[in-house]
């Protein structure tokens, strides 16, 4: 199935049903009073994360989702039926962005997680609601309010522990094939990898981690060269980045300059991503003698000002791969996922009609208070007595 990691959709919640103006009319019951019912609320639009999905391709074809309108109120105080909700299923790892405001509405990071993206309109009030001591036959009602309407951008971001960085043909896909059951395409030409892929690395029966392979970066990727930097977003949730460097490029390019290009493009994309833990991994050491490979790797690390540990591996032959994977596993166990995103309270998404009914009922109560004569005195008794005499 084709991998699609971005899609734009339109979501429209249902309008609220209108209130009803009606009066009770039955035999032997004159002046029965108002009995108009309220309308029904409009249906909502929800997002739901589903671990069985892995692409947004469905939403390249189906782009509009509309919830059902609430039914109007009826006589005999009958309330209209609520509109049916609409649930849109997306892959785990999808970020939902309101294109109108640029606001991130939520990240769908767990299976079964639900997110309200468009709230249905409030129901209108029937004339029964407006009955008071001074208005026994109200003829006013309110209409239902329109449902929310939003244009959303869905961004699928892979959930992985380890992310792979490097120039095209650095050996990223060969590495992920060597350590997992994933089988990305491998060939001797640039941009063999066109879409991100995931692999699960199982160290033993209880320990494993997920590694993400993305298409290679080239100079000017931030300006759109090559495949651009659109796939770097898939590394934002990774805990550690493995920067693969071809120690002996077949095209004769300088490994130091290649590494600097990757670092530069990373910083242009996001300072947060550039600040993530990054490990230097020299690949294809089987093409050189051991001593020559070690000497060349040391020279490259010094030229980059690299003072931390670095690794020498051959993804094709498996040399040094197992030790690297165990060190990655140890790092992941010692640095569990920080629940900063969950602990941080997301900004409240404002819906159009959150306080609509409360405000309406408060206004009605204020009108009743104004009509009520609460400054009773002896001068008012004549009026009351006269009414009773008639």
From Swiss-Prot:
Subcellular locations according to the entry: Cytoplasm
Assigned EC number: 3.6.5.-
GO-annotated cellular components: cytoplasm
Residue span, Obg domain: 1-159
BP GO terms, sorted: ribosome biogenesis
Domain of life: Bacteria
Entry binding sites for GTP: 166-173, 191-195, 213-216, 283-286, 314-316
Disordered: annotated span: 127-147
Cited function: An essential GTPase which binds GTP, GDP and possibly (p)ppGpp with moderate affinity, with high nucleotide exchange rates and a fairly low GTP hydrolysis rate. Plays a role in control of the cell cycle, stress response, ribosome biogenesis and in those bacteria that undergo differentiation, in morphogenesis control.
Record note on quaternary structure: Monomer.
Protein name from the UniProt record: GTPase Obg
């Amino acid at each position: 199935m084709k991998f699609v990691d971005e899609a734009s959709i339109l979501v429209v919640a249902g309008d609220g049903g209108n209130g009803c103006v009606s009066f009770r009319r039955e035999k032997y019951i004159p002046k029965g009073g108002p009995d108009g019912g309220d309308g029904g609320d409009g249906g909502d639009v929800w997002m739901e994360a589903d671990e069985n999905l892995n692409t947004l391709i469905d939403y390249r074809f189906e782009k509009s989702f509309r919830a059902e309108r609430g039914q109007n109120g009826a006589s005999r105080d009958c309330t209209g039926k609520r509109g049916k909700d609409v649930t849109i299923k997306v892959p785990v790892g999808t970020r939902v962005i309101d294109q109108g405001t640029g606001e991130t509405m939520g990240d769908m990071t767990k299976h079964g997680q639900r997110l309200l993206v468009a709230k249905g309109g409030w129901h209108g009030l029937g004339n029964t609601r407006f009955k008071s001591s001074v208005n026994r036959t109200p003829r006013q009602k309110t209409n239902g309010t329109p449902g929310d309407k939003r244009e959303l951008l869905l961004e699928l971001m892979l959930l992985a522990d380890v992310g792979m960085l490097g120039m095209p043909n650095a050996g990223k896909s060969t590495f992920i094939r060597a350590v997992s059951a994933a089988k990305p395409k491998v060939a001797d030409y640039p941009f063999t990898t066109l879409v991100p892929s995931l692999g699960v690395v199982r160290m033993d029966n209880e320990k494993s981690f997920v590694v993400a392979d993305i298409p290679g970066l080239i100079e000017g990727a931030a300006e759109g060269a090559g495949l651009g930097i659109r796939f770097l977003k898939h590394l934002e949730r990774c805990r550690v980045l493995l920067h693969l460097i071809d120690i002996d490029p077949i095209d004769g390019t300088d490994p130091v300059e290649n590494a600097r290009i990757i670092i530069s493009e990373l910083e242009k994309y996001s300072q947060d991503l550039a600040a993530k833990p990054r490990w230097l991994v020299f690949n294809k050491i089987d093409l050189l003698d051991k001593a020559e490979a070690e000497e060349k790797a040391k020279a490259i690390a010094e030229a980059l000002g690299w003072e931390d540990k670095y690794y020498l591996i051959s993804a094709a032959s498996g040399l040094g791969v197992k030790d690297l994977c165990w060190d990655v596993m140890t790092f992941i166990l010692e640095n569990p996922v920080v629940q900063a995103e969950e602990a941080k309270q997301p900004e409240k998404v404002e819906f159009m009609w959150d306080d609509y009914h409360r405000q309406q009922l408060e206004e009605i109560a204020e009108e009743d208070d104004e009509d009520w004569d609460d400054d009773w005195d002896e001068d008012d008794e004549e009026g009351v007595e006269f009414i009773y005499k008639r």
